């Protein structure tokens, strides 16, 4: 059993689908206040902050997992778009191009051990027409996800190819978590 320090329904579903027993507690960490770090350090910092806050709030003897994801596109960090206009603008740029989806992970074990790592997956977005972009943005899905797309949803139709960990793009590297759980359960 572990405690997931995340408000992400996608991460919760990944753990459910992988049959990893867990509970969810939202950390309340304000992700918008930190912008001065490069994308890899940003997601790692936020993952560690989320896990740390939840670790302090719970009394249960559970490992705590914090995660955070952003899309890096042409050197720019794309978190969740704030508006449909912003989502459309991003998709105009991303269509037919590669981006890097970074997910920071931090697992705090019961005995105080801290495991931290960022996993990066290359994402090739499909070449899209303006009407395809408008239709996707109109679903509202892009406003809910880092990078403005959900691989496990309709956004999966807009992704041509991945290089790296599939589940990482959804918000959590399951292979990394498996390795970590083996380490802390030894």
Curated annotation (Swiss-Prot):
Cellular-component GO terms for this entry: cytoplasm
Coiled-coil boundaries: none
InterPro entries found in the cross-reference section: ITPase-like_fam, Maf-like
Cofactor: a divalent metal cation
Catalytic activity, as annotated: a ribonucleoside 5'-triphosphate + H2O = a ribonucleoside 5'-phosphate + diphosphate + H(+); a 2'-deoxyribonucleoside 5'-triphosphate + H2O = a 2'-deoxyribonucleoside 5'-phosphate + diphosphate + H(+)
Keyword Membrane: no
Documented EC number(s): 3.6.1.9
Signal peptide: none
Gene3D superfamilies tied to this protein: 3.90.950.10
GO terms of biological process kind: nucleotide metabolic process
Positions annotated as active site in the UniProt record: 68
CDD domains reported in the protein's UniProt record: Maf
Highest taxon of source: Bacteria
Protein family: Belongs to the Maf family.
PANTHER family: BIFUNCTIONAL DTTP/UTP PYROPHOSPHATASE/METHYLTRANSFERASE PROTEIN-RELATED, BIFUNCTIONAL DTTP_UTP PYROPHOSPHATASE_METHYLTRANSFERASE PROTEIN-RELATED
Purpose of the protein: Nucleoside triphosphate pyrophosphatase. May have a dual role in cell division arrest and in preventing the incorporation of modified nucleotides into cellular nucleic acids.
NCBIfam families associated with the record: maf
UniProt-recorded name of the protein: Nucleoside triphosphate pyrophosphatase
Organism (species): Prochlorococcus marinus (strain MIT 9303)
